[in-house]
Amino acid sequence: MFIDLNVVWPTLGVKDLNLVKTVKTLERLGYTAIALNYQYDGKLQNVIKNPIVKELYPEQKIKIYSRITLTIESMPQNKVLSNVTKEFDILAIRPIGDRLLQQTCSDLEFDILSIDFTQRLPFYLKHTFMGLAVSRDIGIEISYSSGLRDVSNRRNLITNATSLVRATRGRGIIVTSETRTPLECRAGFDVINLATFWDLKQDQARKSVGESCRSVLLHAETRRDTYRSILNGCH
């Protein structure tokens, strides 16, 4: 049972022919659940609508979740987080800068910490911050597909992923594809083998595409239930 929590939701939505092909490919490769990821890097607004369609073809067996990834340069207001909690199953945060990374790991309620590991990072992956995220049951994501496209990207991905494994001692890591096309999809066992190159132990690599992803889904469900309970208590 493999899970991929980052399949990019295309700009064209369901009109993009690669979308259904990609999902069908992942299903054929043995994935039982995926998250379609709406990448939002614009100005944060109180209302962000969910464009994701979960039922893509009649014979679909794979379970689909909706995910939003917010790229933030300052701490978001509670209204923004409340809105995306209502709209999306999974909330991922991509903070820009060392200070914001620290605040994100310690203060925000979310499910996945997303970092672009194909670039040279402007901060160190300190055990203090990463360990804090892990202790709060936040999944820390390594996405592999962009590292397949370019030599420089691949080199940075290996360096940064290895640093993350060292900072977290291999705990709390999820490996995702961030794929846009069927050609970028990899079978679960291939992803496990890839993850061992970043110094993840074999059992940790297996968890990164299975158990750790299920933990993220449980965390997301609990976060949404808590939000609904608070909302109902206010009425």
Swiss-Prot record:
It catalyses: Endonucleolytic cleavage of RNA, removing 5'-extranucleotides from tRNA precursor. The keyword 4Fe-4S does not apply. One of its GO terms (cellular component) is nucleolar ribonuclease P complex. The keyword Nucleus applies. It is found in: Nucleus. Pfam families: RNase_P_p30. GO terms for molecular function: ribonuclease P activity; RNA binding. GO terms for biological process: endonucleolytic cleavage in ITS1 to separate SSU-rRNA from 5.8S rRNA and LSU-rRNA from tricistronic rRNA transcript (SSU-rRNA, 5.8S rRNA, LSU-rRNA); tRNA processing. Its EC number is 3.1.26.5. It comes from the Eukaryota. Keywords: Hydrolase, Nucleus, tRNA processing. Signal peptide: none annotated. It is an enzyme of class 3 (hydrolase). Belongs to the eukaryotic/archaeal RNase P protein component 3 family. Part of ribonuclease P, a protein complex that generates mature tRNA molecules by cleaving their 5'-ends. This is Probable ribonuclease P protein subunit 3. The lineage of its organism: Eukaryota, Fungi, Dikarya, Ascomycota, Taphrinomycotina.
